[in-house]
A protein has these predicted regions:
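Conserved small/polar residues in nucleotide/adenosyl-binding loops
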Residues: 213-216
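Short acidic, glycine-rich surface-loop motifs adjacent to enzyme active sites
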Residues: 90-106
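Short acidic, glycine/serine/threonine-rich loops at helix termini
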Residues: 11-12, 34-40, 71, 107-108, ...
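PLP-dependent aspartate aminotransferase-fold enzymes
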Residues: 1-95
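Active-site nucleophile and cofactor-binding loops and adjacent substrate-binding regions
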Residues: 1-4, 27-30, 135, 161-165, ...
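Active-site PLP attachment segment
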Residues: 35, 149-182, 195-202
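Catalytic PLP-binding core of fold-type I/II PLP enzymes
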Residues: 92, 108-142
Length: 216
């Protein structure tokens, strides 16, 4: 019923599919208020009242588009630093999760070229690429329906939240058939009120409205 719960499920799916435990995240990122969400949210664990960075977390710098007028150089430079972190890690990575605009970091768009460079490196590790679209999805960026579209990449998992219901508490995880099948072999996902008909009706109405006003 929320982006937090959806991100929690995405983490479980990534770890089950990859067989790995480590997660790569961005500085100032926020992915929810569950324990698993806090563990991957620098915005939370680096807070003065936070629990600190866990051993299985690899934190990369934000490829900040505002840092340089030549933002493509910024994206590639940040990607190269992240790749070094990946190669220096003793553990293989389960997933890389990022928002395309880092909300709690100051609404910072990721610099061009970053995701196109980092995604293949994550996949070489057997990891999956997660796009957290809780704040950016469903046309909220104007020119793109999904944030990852402006970076010309295709994630392995996409996480959706309340914009799916125009603020109504609803969330979803979209992934490939291969990852979904891997997750079927693990502990069952269960939600007491999952698939609530009222929430589903609201979600469908929002989607139909989006399609009505975004179709050419």
């Amino acid at each position: 019923n929320s982006g937090s719960e959806a991100n929690d499920l995405a983490i479980r799916m990534a770890k089950k599919h990859s067989g790995n435990k480590s997660m790569m995240v961005l500085e100032h990122g926020y992915h929810g208020h569950t324990q698993a969400g806090i563990d991957i949210s620098d915005y939370k664990f680096s807070n003065l009242k936070g629990e600190g960075q866990k051993n299985h977390i690899i934190k990369a710098e934000i490829p900040n588009e505002y840092d340089s007028q030549k933002s493509i150089k910024t994206g590639l430079s940040s990607a190269e630093k992240a790749i070094k972190q990946i190669k220096n890690s003793t553990d293989s990575i389960a997933a890389f999760i990022a928002e395309t605009i880092v909300g709690c970091g100051g609404q910072v768009p990721l610099a061009p070229g970053y995701l196109k460079t980092i995604y293949p490196e994550i996949r070489k590790q057997g990891g999956v690429c997660i796009s957290d679209e809780v704040q950016t999805g469903f046309g909220r960026l104007g020119s793109w329906f999904w944030g990852f579209e402006m970076h010309e990449v295709v994630p392995d998992i996409v996480v959706l939240g309340k914009p799916m219901g125009n603020g109504h508490p609803i969330g979803a995880v979209v992934t490939t058939a291969e990852i979904a099948h891997s997750f079927e072999q693990g502990v069952e996902f269960f939600s007491s009120f999952g698939g609530n008909p009222v929430s589903c009706a609201i979600g469908m109405a929002v989607l139909q409205t989006c399609l009505l006003y975004t179709s050419p």
